[in-house]
Amino acid sequence: MEDTLSGEEGEEEEEEEPAPAPAPQDPVEPQLTEASQVLGASEIKQLSLHLPPRVTGHPWSLVFCTSRDGFSLRRLYRQMEGHSGPVLLLLRDQDGQMFGAFSSSAIRLSKGFYGTGETFLFSFSPQLKVFKWTGHNSFFVKGDLDSLMMGSGSGQFGLWLDGDLYHGGSYPCATFNNEVLARREQFCIKELEAWVLS
């Protein structure tokens, strides 16, 4: 009889006190593998609210940064090899302006444009402004050896970076109907980070 009672008690305990589940990660608080040199915690939290639900809760892994890896687009492509997940590009220019882009897939060399409508541009000027896909065209991301381009239309790019990742530009484009992301259409990069979100 004791066996039966203890068995019943054990069953009751399981129903009343299941093993505690790990506390869910706050989807607004991304887990970064290391500190960003471009954005602070407040900006990261604001930006994370605009990321697609499929990447919410995924850790942010710093795959490339100019302070560690140097100013080289080819090096950025090499660091991206083997990664397929979405990428967040964070930039700070010589004027201190912070801006960047979310790419739905890894940054890579390509003959044409690639990506999906999840891709967007953003700027902190000083408040966060996010420029999502308009549906007018599908010119999301294109990478060649001399430049990386995001968004296009009428011969202008929403964001472009040159091969040495030192100079860049931003112009209004049909893909995102964006404003100029930096204070000026042409800028010099002080720091660039590429975070894989997967």
UniProtKB/Swiss-Prot annotation:
Residues 1-30 are annotated as: Disordered. Residues 37-198 form the TLDc domain. PROSITE patterns: TLDC. GO terms for biological process: negative regulation of cellular response to oxidative stress. Residues 1-18 have a biased composition (Acidic residues). Belongs to the OXR1 family. PANTHER family: NUCLEOLAR PROTEIN 7/ESTROGEN RECEPTOR COACTIVATOR-RELATED, TLD DOMAIN-CONTAINING PROTEIN 2. This is TLD domain-containing protein 2. It comes from Mus musculus. The gene is Tldc2.
